[in-house]
Structures are given as structure tokens and as C-alpha cells.
């Protein structure tokens, strides 16, 4: 791709399915539930390696439980298992219509989820950007938003939910520690959506992302943001104005009501801020995720309020 593509709906449907990976390759699919009506958020996260080793994760936070509730299951999946019916322990994921519809569920001891996702726009594939996906962070990835209908039960308490979901899919090499820092940002109202991924590695900053509104998706060419930390160096305020390749702009304000904390590597720490947003004046939901080198984060957090 030598210029900024606009034909996002033509991204091949085979990439909605499982990929053949090298032994050091990794494939993962994040499904993020944003539930401000309960003060809750969570995710279901299937991942697998080229070796066949796989993991399913479920994680939720909310005011009804004092600590983040997490469950996971590790195992080995068959080489011929597809995303039409991917199963591991308590997790099942089924891509029922490529790049459009997904069923996903978790039946654990504390967490039980059954959800149906339907996309509201075409997938944004990083390969459609002239510089593609940074190769240390995968061969490719797609980002997509959609509507979700879910029944969620945590510790026996029911949380029926109709809302909006953030979903991403990545495959290929994944060397978490190379990024010194990244910002993985999403916002959606259902009618409009925005995403950007700003990665800082090897002294360079890479930006990928899209703006979707009025039925048109375009690459982002600029993001201008401000944010503020709390005393634990968790992002609590975030505002951004984005500009796309057609010169369109959107302004989004994030009211971060809670943070999911996770890590997939001892060198990194991931703080996923879950938010209500105002997107060009319309209500929506979003994600404001900051990833840090763990040594830097552990050192710098004592100074975040004063200097950050």
C-alpha cells in the first residue's frame, strides 16, 4: 500500500479467522465490555501461540466487588480448531459472520457471560496503512466497534447489558517489551467511531488509527491530546482532537470511571481506562489504555501528580 487506503470494507474475510503462526507467533482477540450503567467494565480474551498453547481470560471490575475479578484457563488447542467454534475450558468464541458478527461466552466459577457482537463499521486493518503494523507487534491487526447484547453474572449477581463493545484481533510476533510506552485509544457512539494506536519504540513514534462517521472511514493523520494522572499514575482525564486524511476533525472527552489492570509480560504494565465519552457532543463509551515499561512505571508513579 503506497498511499492511504479508503476501501476498508474490502479487507479479506479470511483474516477474520484463525491464522497459521510460526512457533513464536501469537494470535489474540480482545472483547471489551463497557458498562457505565453499572460502573463496570471487563473483557473476554482468547489467545493462542503457534505451538498450540492457548489461554482464555475473563476479567471484570465494578463497585459490587472490591477487587478486580479474574479467571483464566490454560490448555492446548487442536491445530484444526477454527474460529467458527473456538473452545478452551470455560470459553467459547464463534465468528458467525466474518468481520460482522461474533458470539462469545465464558462459564466459570465466579464469572458467567453470554454475548452477541455485531459490528457497526468495517474492520480497520493496520496493513492498509502505508507502514503497516510495527512488525514486533504482529503481522497485522484489526480494530472494530459494535453493538453487544450480553447476560453477565458475577458472584451470582446478574448484570444484563445492551451496549457497545471494543473488539480487536492481532496475529504474528508479539514482543511486549519493545514498546517503552503506548496509547491504545477507542471511542464509539454506535453511529461514529474513533481509534488510534500510538506506539513508542526505538526512539520513534508510530501512529495508526481511523475516524468513522457519516458512513465514511478514513485513516487518522494527527492526534492532539491532553491527559492527567492520579496519585497511582492511572490516567483519569483524557481529551483528544483527531484529524483524518480528508481533513475531518472530531473532539472527544473521556470520563474514566475505572481501570482494568493487566500484564502479558513481566516487562510491561497495562492500565486500561474505561470511560464514558462525549464524541462531538454525543454520548458514547471508550477505552483509554496506557502501556508502560514496568521499571519506568514503578519509578515514575511517585512523581506523576507533581510532574506528569
Where are these regions (language model features)?
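Structured soluble/peripheral alpha/beta segments that form catalytic or ligand/cofactor-binding pockets
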Residues: 1-308
